[in-house]
């Protein structure tokens, strides 16, 4: 087995995060030859990242949103104009889920995407009917 440093693979995300180092997940390949599966969906990036880095504890998962939000903004040095605060652009997503864990675990559908206070995407929740055999 490969020990650290890996010749190709992921770094020690859990350890870096635990030490307070800014860790962010991202995707720069969208439907290209390097990664044809890339679609720009950061929830997919996070879902795969949590599996690949073995971040599986409930608290870790509940805090993982930072890897694709706050920490990414810090990495790109746009943290002063990022976040849900008075005076900042209203950029956010609303998922059909009770909490962050369920949004990731259930691959919850995106209900709203808001950019600069304008609704860009609105999805009507799916209606599901389950019929059990008698």
Where do the language-model regions lie?
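Short Asp/Glu-rich motifs
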Residues: 1, 35-36, 106, 132
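Active-site core of metal-dependent hydrolases
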Residues: 1-11
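Short low-complexity, flexible loop/linker segments enriched in glycine and/or proline
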Residues: 4-5, 39-42, 110-112
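His/Asp/Glu-enriched, well-ordered alpha-helical/loop segment
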Residues: 9-95
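C-terminal cap of metal-dependent C-N hydrolases
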Residues: 86-134
């Amino acid at each position: 087995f490969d020990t650290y440093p890996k010749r190709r693979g992921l770094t020690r995300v859990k350890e870096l995060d635990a030490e307070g180092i800014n860790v962010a997940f991202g995707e720069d390949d969208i439907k290209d030859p390097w990664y044809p599966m890339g679609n720009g969906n950061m929830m997919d990036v996070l879902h795969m990242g949590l599996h690949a880095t073995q971040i599986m504890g409930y608290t870790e998962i509940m805090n993982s949103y930072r890897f694709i939000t706050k920490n990414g903004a810090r990495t790109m040095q746009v943290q002063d104009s990022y976040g849900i605060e008075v005076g900042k652009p209203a950029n956010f997503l609303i998922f059909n889920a009770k909490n962050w864990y369920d949004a990731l675990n259930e691959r919850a559908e995106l209900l709203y995407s808001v950019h600069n206070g304008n609704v860009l995407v609105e999805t009507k929740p799916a209606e599901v009917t389950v019929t059990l055999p008698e």
